[in-house]
Regions:
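Short, well-ordered beta-to-alpha junction loops that form the rim of enzyme active sites
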Residues: 53-55, 116
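Acidic/histidine-rich helix-loop elements
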Residues: 19-28, 153-155
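Active-site-adjacent betaalpha module
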Residues: 1-8, 36-40, 44-45, 62-189
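N-terminal nucleotide-binding beta1-loop-alpha1 segment
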Residues: 9-14
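A short acidic, helix-capping loop that chelates divalent metal ions and anchors anionic groups
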Residues: 18-22, 58-61, 147-149
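A short alpha/beta connector and helix-capping loop motif
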Residues: 23-51
Length: 189
């Protein structure tokens, strides 16, 4: 992994509503702590940090736009006043937002993706990022997945969901990295 230029750090949908039992079991309980490590390094270097905030239109969702607590960012990684937040109501951080034009205006060539959840916003945004021509890095231990039940009523563990989503993104859509690898590389530069 060789990170070119300073990539924009994308922090996707790390909101209190994802702590609701509605989502089921989750993997990577340390994801928010890893995001905080990356945020701290990006802030120290004054690099581009961009958040997305999901405002669901589904009334039963803990992320429904009327659920004021559910849509709030988790305190551990809450944006600072000068950091940009793009609000959205679909899985992709690029749809219905100015994310792409903002990145192009800032001449950002690469992005480092973190956030929740691996099978929703993270995967969808990583795919779109690559398709739009951005060099895309996905921090596998700074993202997390939730268990799902498939069409045959089989429950798939969050670990398996995460593993398969990461595998599907690997090489074709994103370079998969870990928090420690990113931080080590930055210290060497």
């Amino acid at each position: 992994m060789k990170i070119i230029n300073p990539p924009a750090l994308l922090v996707l949908d790390v909101q209190k509503g994802f702590d609701d039992p509605f989502w089921g079991k989750r993997n990577n309980p340390q994801a928010e702590e890893n995001i905080l490590l990356l945020l701290t390094e990006w802030r120290k270097r004054d690099w581009e940090i961009i958040y997305s905030q999901h405002l669901s239109l589904l009334p039963h969702s803990p992320l429904h736009y009327k659920n004021k607590t559910g849509v709030e960012f988790k305190e551990i990684i809450a944006p600072l006043p000068q950091e940009i937040v793009f609000q959205k109501n679909v899985n992709s951080a690029f749809i219905g937002t100015e994310l792409e034009s903002h990145l192009r205006e800032k001449q950002v060539q690469s992005v480092l993706i973190t956030g929740l959840s691996t099978q929703h916003c993270v995967s969808t945004s990583a795919r779109m990022s690559a398709n739009l021509g951005f060099e895309t890095f996905l921090v596998e231990d700074a993202t997390a997945a939730y268990e799902i039940t498939d069409h045959t009523n089989t429950t798939i563990t969050p670990e398996d969901v995460h593993k398969h989503e990461i595998a599907a993104l690997h090489k074709e859509f994103a370079t998969i990295v870990k928090t420690d690898d990113v931080l080590t590389q930055l210290k060497q530069s």
